[in-house]
């Protein structure tokens, strides 16, 4: 089965222990079955940029989470999107096939 995760679900997975039911569900579904749409990535990116203006320290944490977790899990590890995302991957210095995990 395939699941498309909404922005609030992806955000709920950011902090371990904050939303145990969401984390338990995500752990029960293989990462390969979890997807996000482009608008979800854009909404998260918009939130990170907004936080950069008001709280640079927190924005660093959010940026690292977005770049190291969200993009790696949902974009760079998916072979079908690699050709589209390759320029972004190179820009932020990713190895497209390194290991992934939520936390």
From Swiss-Prot:
Function, in words: Toxic component of a type II toxin-antitoxin (TA) system. An RNase. The cognate antitoxin is VapB14.
EC assignment: 3.1.-.-
Binding site for Mg(2+): 6
Family of the protein in this entry: Belongs to the PINc/VapC protein family.
Domain PINc: 3-74
InterPro entries per UniProt: PIN-like_dom_sf, Type_II_TA_system_RNase
Protein name: Ribonuclease VapC14
Single GO term (MF): nuclease activity
Cofactor(s), names only, from the UniProt record: Mg(2+)
Keywords for this protein: Hydrolase, Magnesium, Metal-binding, Nuclease, Toxin-antitoxin system
SUPFAM superfamilies found in the cross-reference section: PIN domain-like (SSF88723)
């Amino acid at each position: 089965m395939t699941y498309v995760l909404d922005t609030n679900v992806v955000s709920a997975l950011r902090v371990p222990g904050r939303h145990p039911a969401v984390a338990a569900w995500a752990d029960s579904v293989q990462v390969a079955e979890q997807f996000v749409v482009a608008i979800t990535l854009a909404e998260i990116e918009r939130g990170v940029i907004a936080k950069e203006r008001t709280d640079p320290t927190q924005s660093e944490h959010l940026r690292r989470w977005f770049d190291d977790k969200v993009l790696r899990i949902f974009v760079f590890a998916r072979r079908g999107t690699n050709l589209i995302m390759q320029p972004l991957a190179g820009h932020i210095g990713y190895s497209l096939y390194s290991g992934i995990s939520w936390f």
